[in-house]
């Protein structure tokens, strides 16, 4: 069963999709250029613009930068029972043993942006495959509440409730037949 979707204005044609995509790309490009001019920094190349007179960028040591802004290596933590963990960390393509603390350009305040190599590209390793994938089923309302079915002890062709008497000893109903009942 497919998920429900709402299409308020009808399905777009391929031409409308391409026009929308072009419009969005132009808007993003315009916004990037405005921000680049505003801050004097090329965010795509991650370098300062040469003509930026308003800002002076300088390299600072890593220990002077707050922890929030430091580059970190991400690890994935999972339980061993559900996944086969072989290696789930991110590593740079250049060398897996390089860490940010050992990198000389981060520690050397005299280095410039031009001396840097191209930025490292991070390679995501394949996520571990689950050993057993549980099948999802659509839950029912009765899964969330207790359901008790009421027994209908008196059907239309049985005796009326007037003839059912509860005795104090057994707590079971005693059913009298019409022949044994007195009218009074």
Curated annotation (Swiss-Prot):
It comes from the Eukaryota. Its main location: nucleus. In embryos, expression is first seen in pharyngeal primordium and later in all differentiating cells. Post embryonic expression corresponds to developmental patterns of cell cycle progression in many tissues including sex myoblasts, distal tip cells, vulval cells, seam cells, neurons, intestine cells and hypodermal cells. InterPro entries: CDI_dom, CDI_dom_sf. One of its GO terms (molecular function) is cyclin-dependent protein serine/threonine kinase inhibitor activity. The keyword Secreted does not apply. Residues 85-184 are annotated as: Disordered. One of its GO terms (biological process) is regulation of cell differentiation. It is found in: Nucleus. One of its GO terms (cellular component) is nucleus. Residues 85-98 have a biased composition (Low complexity). Disruption phenotype: RNAi-mediated knockdown results in additional cell divisions in postembryonic intestinal cells characterized by a premature entry into S phase. Interacts with cyd-1; the interaction is direct. Belongs to the CDI family. This is Cyclin-dependent kinase inhibitor 1. The gene is cki-1.
């Amino acid at each position: 069963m497919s998920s429900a979707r709402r299409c308020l204005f009808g399905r777009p044609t391929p031409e409308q999709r391409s026009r929308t995509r072009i419009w969005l790309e132009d808007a993003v490009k315009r916004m990037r250029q405005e921000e680049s001019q505003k801050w004097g920094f090329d965010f795509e190349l991650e370098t300062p613009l040469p003509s930026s007179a308003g800002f002076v960028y300088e390299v600072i040591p890593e220990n002077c930068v707050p922890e929030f802004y430091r580059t970190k290596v991400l690890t994935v933590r999972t339980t061993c029972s559900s996944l086969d963990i072989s290696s789930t960390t991110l590593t740079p393509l250049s060398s897996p043993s390089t860490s940010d603390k050992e990198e000389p350009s981060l520690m050397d305040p005299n280095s410039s942006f031009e001396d840097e190599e191209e930025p490292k590209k991070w390679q995501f390793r394949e996520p571990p495959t689950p050993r057993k994938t549980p099948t999802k089923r659509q839950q029912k309302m009765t899964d969330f509440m207790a359901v008790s079915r009421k027994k209908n002890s008196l059907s239309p062709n049985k005796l009326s409730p007037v003839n059912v008497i509860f005795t104090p000893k057994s707590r079971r109903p005693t059913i009298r037949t019409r022949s044994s009942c007195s009218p009074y």
